[in-house]
């Protein structure tokens, strides 16, 4: 059961080679939120943010086509300051799926218990 307590924002580095990289592990009793994702892709390709549950069902939350060395900056939902860009339900892990190159950057996230 959620206690409706919200954590402070946590920042961490992201390095995601071609394929699937778990950037936030699943938590059975908490929601995870990504407020900001900033970085670039080493060569042209796509970056997708995906929620995957324990049954391996996928929810694609966003896919972005990037050129060689092109940067990506995603922040809280536009016009709704403080509302996270990406939300992960209890039991879902956050996965960054890349094609073409390595995504290098950082993310800011929070947790609701």
Where are these regions (language model features)?
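Beta-strand-centric surfaces of beta-sandwich/beta-rich domains
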Residues: 1-113
């Amino acid at each position: 059961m959620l206690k409706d307590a919200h954590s402070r924002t946590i920042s961490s580095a992201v390095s995601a080679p071609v394929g699937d990289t778990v950037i936030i592990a699943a938590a059975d009793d908490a929601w995870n939120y990504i407020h900001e994702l900033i970085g670039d892709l080493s060569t042209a390709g796509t970056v997708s943010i995906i929620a995957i549950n324990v049954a391996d069902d996928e929810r694609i939350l966003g896919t972005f086509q990037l050129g060689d060395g092109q940067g990506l900056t995603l922040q809280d939902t536009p016009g709704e300051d403080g509302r996270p860009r990406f939300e992960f339900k209890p039991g879902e892990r956050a996965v960054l799926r890349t094609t073409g190159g390595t995504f290098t950057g950082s993310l800011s996230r929070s947790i609701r218990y």
